[in-house]
UniProtKB/Swiss-Prot annotation:
The lineage of its organism: Bacteria, Bacillati, Cyanobacteriota, Cyanophyceae, Synechococcales. Consists of a catalytic RNA component (M1 or rnpB) and a protein subunit. GO terms for molecular function: 3'-tRNA processing endoribonuclease activity; ribonuclease P activity; tRNA binding. It comes from Prochlorococcus marinus (strain SARG / CCMP1375 / SS120). Pfam families: Ribonuclease_P. This is Ribonuclease P protein component. Keywords: Endonuclease, Hydrolase, Nuclease, RNA-binding, tRNA processing.
Amino acid sequence: MVLPKGMRLKGYKSFDYIHKSAKRYKSDSMMLRVTKANERLIKSTIKNSKSNSCRCAISISNKVSKKAVIRNRLRRLLHNHLKKRLFQKDAFSNNWLLLSLSPKCLDKNTENLLEECDKLLIEAGFC
């Protein structure tokens, strides 16, 4: 299940902003970048959505796997997990999150990967 349109983070300007100004939290197989929302970088059609101002993106490079099937499976898994967390609490409001996976994530099973994601969210102060 993908995130609703109002919670998706899109556009190269948004990603550049996150890479330049975000606070980083790193673990063995992923990195979480968190920054305050900058609504000027969002297109006007997306701004009108009924979502809170929290937006998320998951970045998985070809280094993780050459097969798109595997990368998409990981993306869907993490989108679903973040979606549950976002609706569970309003602590994410007014923040942008970028979750980047490293090639070591393939060595872990799904439970360990989700636990690691939770640890990063706790370290960032969201849970």
